[in-house]
Amino acid sequence: MDKNISVMLSVVVPVYNVEETLDRCVDSILKQGVDNMEIILVDDGSLDGSPALCDAWSKRNERIKVIHKSNGGLSDARNAGIEQARGEYVTFVDSDDYLEEGTYKGLLDWLSKNEACDILEYPLKHIGTDKRITSRCTDMQFASARHYWFATEAWEHSYAVNKIYRRTLFEYVRFPIGRVFEDIYTLPQLLCKNPHVATSSHGAYCYVWNEGGISALSSKNVVSTKQHLEALMLAAKTMETRLWSSNGYKIYLSMLYRQLDIYGMSGEIVLKWPLIRLVCWLHNKLR
């Protein structure tokens, strides 16, 4: 792509050992009906045929560029893409997922008419062999980032992938290296900049459920569950979420459930709440 051409949207796609799904992912992005878009494929040290597929795509379409790097994990790959992004807006797609056709076109058309918007969230579908659950969004603009945080219980849908962000929001924000549930860490940092946030019912991001993935295994893995709890704790602190805040108690319930899981697996207490050890012990005995 000519460097003098204005780029509306940068799509960052981390790639790691996904030769079976990469073509579907990239093809779905190219079918979005957006010309002034760049696709950044970040090969994160793949050991299969993914690097060659990335290079083949870049030769076939000038809007696609490739970064080859040593393995650093999902956050590191996203960060590498952010560093190279030139678009007014940036978004993320995981390489085993895909988009409904025309999703970006409709969202960018809306953004061009609502230039004050900094973060636009759209529907996400969980797709698997036995489930298809849609995370719906209504057409709404929020008075403040905190209003969005509480009104939508954003900690429950902090996914990085079903949102379009003004790229400048990431000027001093990056995804945390070496952590799972990295999205829960990152979204509050962006919201602290008090961006204008909106949600849209248009289109869908199709998240392909993987029974062997982090989300599926988190409740069975004490390390992942601890990191989930720690992410929720930091998110609540960053967004000044009090127990008595509107809907705020729900994030504390999520913390409690993670703590109960951790105690059941390892007997460890992470939350420093009064009587939490007794609550965990009773729950473990009575379940």
Q: Where do the model's predicted regions map?
A:
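Short aromatic/hydrophobic "clamp" motif used to bind/position activated sugar donors
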Residues: V90
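N-proximal low-complexity "stem/linker" segments adjacent to membrane-targeting elements
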Residues: M1-K31
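C-terminal subregions of glycosyltransferases and related glycan-biosynthesis enzymes
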Residues: Y159, V208-R287
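Flexible acidic/His/Gly-enriched loops in nucleotide-sugar-dependent glycosyltransferase catalytic domains
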Residues: T103-I177
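A conserved acidic beta->alpha catalytic loop
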Residues: S28, D43-A52, S70
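The conserved acidic donor/metal-binding loop of glycosyltransferases
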Residues: D94-Y98
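Conserved nucleotide-sugar donor-binding catalytic segment
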Residues: R146-N221
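Glycine-rich, basic loop-to-helix element that forms the pyrophosphate-binding segment
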Residues: K69-A85
